[in-house]
């Protein structure tokens, strides 16, 4: 049944998505740089731990934020963060296996899954133009992976699975914006995913991973600490301002940006 919501305001959505685009592009570059020294679980530990520390510091400075951590939808938070952690791990893994532009291009099968889930779970409207955009996106993916030819890489399946997981995470995140604040969603995300990352580090038995870093590695570490937060803050606020079906396709703008950066860096 079509949603009765008014059309999404384009201005705020575009502004928040510009922040999302820049943050996640910098995140990808930082992860790729650190992957030469650190395992993926160690990188995810840095991201979640720094998120908890920064958000806790904000709560100390602004005590009113503490009330925003409470949520009546903890089960939905658990589902969202479990799926998101898996998606993030697969995404980070794909960054070590494939060129940056290829990773981002294949990641953008997510809008198709988001469109379907948003219609089924959120009651959003799937227009003809949006269907066309989804179809064109899938055609682009087929051009990139070229299934059935020699150039096909099994590693492309890693990012395709990550895209499916991200789509579930995106729709549940949109659902959470209907009841929870941006601060609360971010704090719970980092607090839930930190033990998951630490468990991975524990099984590897290497808690001294920061000692392997030299002076040149700390810039991407700082990048992960901050853009890991700003990316999700901007994306959450974009979902608060507009429909998921409208917001997610704007992320396609990351492809030319990361292709340009990847060409000069790698």
Role assignments for model-derived ranges:
Residues 29-32, 40-41, 55, 151-213, ...:
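Transmembrane alpha-helical segments that form core, pore/gating elements
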Residues 2-5, 52-72, 139-151, 194-217, ...:
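Membrane-interface helix-cap regions at the ends of transmembrane helices
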Residues 37-86, 165-168, 188-205:
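Transmembrane alpha-helices of multi-pass small-molecule transport proteins
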Residues 129-146, 162:
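Hydrophobic transmembrane alpha-helices of multi-pass small-molecule transport proteins
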Residues 21-29, 56, 81-89, 111-116, ...:
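Hydrophobic/small/kink-forming positions within alpha-helical transmembrane segments
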Residues 12-20, 65-90, 154-162, 210-230:
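Loop-to-transmembrane-helix transition segments
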Residues 91-93, 110-132, 256-266:
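C-terminal transmembrane-helix exit sites in multi-pass transporters
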Residues 103-109, 176-192, 232-263:
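Helix-helix packing/entry segments at the starts of transmembrane helices
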């Amino acid at each position: 049944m079509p949603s009765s919501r008014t059309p999404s305001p384009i201005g705020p959505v575009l502004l928040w998505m510009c922040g999302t685009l820049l943050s996640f592009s910098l995140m990808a570059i930082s992860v790729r740089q650190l992957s030469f020294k650190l395992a993926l679980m160690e990188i995810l530990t840095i991201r979640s731990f720094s998120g908890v520390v920064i958000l806790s510091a904000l709560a100390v400075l602004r005590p009113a934020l503490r009330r925003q951590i409470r949520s009546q939808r903890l089960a939905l938070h658990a589902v969202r963060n479990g799926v998101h952690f898996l998606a993030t791990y697969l995404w980070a893994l794909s960054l070590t296996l494939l060129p940056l532009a290829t990773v981002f291009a294949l990641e953008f099968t997510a809008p198709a899954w988001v469109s379907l889930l948003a219609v089924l779970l959120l009651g959003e409207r799937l227009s003809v133009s949006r269907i066309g955009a989804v179809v064109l996106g899938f055609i682009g993916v087929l051009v990139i992976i070229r299934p059935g030819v020699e150039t096909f890489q099994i590693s492309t399946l890693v990012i395709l699975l990550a895209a499916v997981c991200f789509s579930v995470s995106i729709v549940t995140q949109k659902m959470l914006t209907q009841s929870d604040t941006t601060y609360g969603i971010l704090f719970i995300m980092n607090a839930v995913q930190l033990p998951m990352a630490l468990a991975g580090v524990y099984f590897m038995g290497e808690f001294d991973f920061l000692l392997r870093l030299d002076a040149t590695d700390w810039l991407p570490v700082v990048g992960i600490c901050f853009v890991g937060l700003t990316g999700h803050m901007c994306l959450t606020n974009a979902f608060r301002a507009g429909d998921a079906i409208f917001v997610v396709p704007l992320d396609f703008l990351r492809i030319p940006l990361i292709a340009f950066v990847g060409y000069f860096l790698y």
